[in-house]
């Protein structure tokens, strides 16, 4: 890109100033990374004052787009780019790589600042012309332990604990460490503590030992805050049939932050293995297979095997994607990768990795997927949210909900469904009983949200997308001002034929203090109104 002379001069002056401001901190970082190595010296020179010509721009884009998509300048307002570029250079310094040609940091900052807007603008999605034909009644839920410890619900699940009993609401509280169940048929709504873990996240019901009772597979983060450590675990809550109690059995420990764990009979032996999304943070994280090595009639015994070394995997749902009779799994990988990938089971313990879709920007904020046939064509699609703002507390204009439509032969077509700041979980269900799937979604944003000009109380926190024709949706906003819902589950909780949903509250979220000790709320579907 050829720049006019006046603009080039402006960029040169900005680059020099920004570089001088960052020399000290960056020098300490780079010297700490390798005190004896001078290969980073060009980053610390005044060469940043060179004009940004086409060759320099190519150098910047080559460096900033080597392991992920080149960041979009419009992802942040102008004054944010110094911090964002510095983080990228820090990441490169820590990586130990020497194969790239990093431009002087001040020049890179100046390049992105020159293209970034002074202030961000946020989209205003169109809403439905008429109200949703279904009304809801909300019921806040409280749990006695939240009086002492504010709730931080990370996962909700609607499942049976006994094959011959009705489903119950299961929840994981990543602050208190509790895994709890709540029978919504009980008038008192008293919760039962099933286990005390460290920082539980995803809960997956399964019969891991094949004894006919329903166990719980739990991903335990190992910390409340996002840091690198080795305290993450995969925990099997083994259901003791005679007593109804759950015994904690650790399947894997010494891991980074574990976000998800799913059972998979990888080679159709009749014994369940486990796929693990070890999200980690910056230096920890990967995708693991816990291979069940137990013999017939023995209790499960697992050996870990790394399938992918990247950090940032959020979800690993299991599905036979290529219809060959062998279970595959999908992985939503965030951090700088921002992609959905299929791990196709080749048999004999081998998987072939294939990218199904990749976001155009490393700040996309991927945070959840659901596998569901959204348009009713018989093929499993991917419902996908991107609204993670907890890495920098910054509200992105790109947050929202999308649908990756399965066209067959492992080809998926991208459809943007709606914009939604902090979109965290989206689940499909037929809420209006018309035979097709609608979508309910919740948002989760941090306290101290930036930029400060954002009016948090005006932001949508629960949205419903009504499917009005195959693959076509209109938007209804059910709630505003409480973007602290980190969990969501859908089910017919009262067995009246109408689909309800429940939300989980996390006090890390914005405006959570206004909800007090309410750890969850049920939105009871009261059925269709008279509108045709």
Residue map of PLM features:
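N-terminal Sec-pathway targeting helices
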Residues: 2-20
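Juxtamembrane cytosolic interface motif at the C-terminal end of transmembrane helices
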Residues: 25-32
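Accessible peptide chain termini
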Residues: 1-2, 530
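Beta-propeller-forming repeat regions
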Residues: 33, 37, 42-532
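Alpha-helical transmembrane segments
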Residues: 21-25, 337
